Amino acid sequence: MIPSLWISKTGLDAQQINMNVISNNLANVSTNGFKRSRAVFEDLMYQTMRQAGTNSSIDTTLPSGLQLGTGVRPVSTEKIYSQGNLSKTDSSKDVAINGPGFFQVQLPDGNIAYTRDGSFQLDQNGQLVTNSGYPIIPEINIPPNSINMNIGRDGIVSVTIQGQTQPISIGQLNLINFVNHSGLESLGENLYQETQASGNPIDTTPGLNGTGLLYQGYVETSNVNVAEELVNMIQTQRAYEINSKSINTSDQMLQKLSQL
C-alpha cells in the first residue's frame, strides 16, 4: 500500500470526527446553557528522508530537508465557554448567569456536578431542582405559603410569605468557577464534572472573584452560531471529498503499477 492511501484515510477519519462535533453543536442550538465544541487536530510523525543542515558536498550544506508527513489525528474536543444570549422568560424560577461560573448540583450517587442551565423547577418538597430533578447546592427550599420569590444579582434568595409584607431571606445561590473550564468533563443533561485538568472548584458569591451576576427571569441560550457551524460543515464536507478523491487517485496509481 502506498503511503498516500493511509494518509488520506487519516484525513477521512479526522473530517468525520469534525462533522460529528459540528452536528452535535447544531443539534443543541436550542439547549439552555449549551457550550459549543470544536475539534482540535495535530499532524502525525514525519519520515525524514534528508536531514536539513547535512552536507550536500564538502563545502555546502542542505538549506532544507526532505520530510514526508504521515497524516493527521484528533487530539481533543475543546468546549468554547463564550457567553450565550440571555432570553427573557419572566419565570421566577429561571436564573441566567451573565459571566463565568456554574451552579452546583447534587447527583443521585452523591457526586457533585455543575451546570450553566438555570431553568430550575420545584420538587414536591418545594426544593429548587434542575429539570432532571437534581437539587441545587446549597439547598434552596421555598415555603409552601410563599407568594413571591426574588433572586438578587448576588444570589440571595428571598420570599414573601402570605399575610406578610416584608420579604425574608431563605438562602444563597453561589457560583462555582474553575481555572481551566476546558478541562471539565461533559456528562450530558447540561452537566459538567471536574477533572484534574479543570482544577479544583472555587466557590464564590456571584459577582466576586471573576464570576458573573445572576439575572432572574432569564435563561442563557446556547452559544452555537448556526451560520458559523454551517460554514464549518461546508468546509468539512469539501475536505472529506478531497481526501476521498486522494484515495481514488492513489488507487488508480496502484492499478497502473499492477499493469506494468
Curated annotation (Swiss-Prot):
GO terms for biological process: bacterial-type flagellum-dependent swarming motility. Coiled coil: none annotated. This is Flagellar basal-body rod protein FlgG. The gene is flgG. InterPro entries: Flag_bb_rod_N, Flagellar_basal_body_rod_CS, Flagellar_FlgE/F/G, Flg_bb/hook_C_dom, FlgE/F/G-like, FlgG_G_neg, LlgE_F_G-like_D1. SUPFAM superfamilies: Flagellar hook protein flgE. The basal body constitutes a major portion of the flagellar organelle and consists of four rings (L,P,S, and M) mounted on a central rod. The rod consists of about 26 subunits of FlgG in the distal portion, and FlgB, FlgC and FlgF are thought to build up the proximal portion of the rod with about 6 subunits each. GO terms for cellular component: bacterial-type flagellum basal body, distal rod.
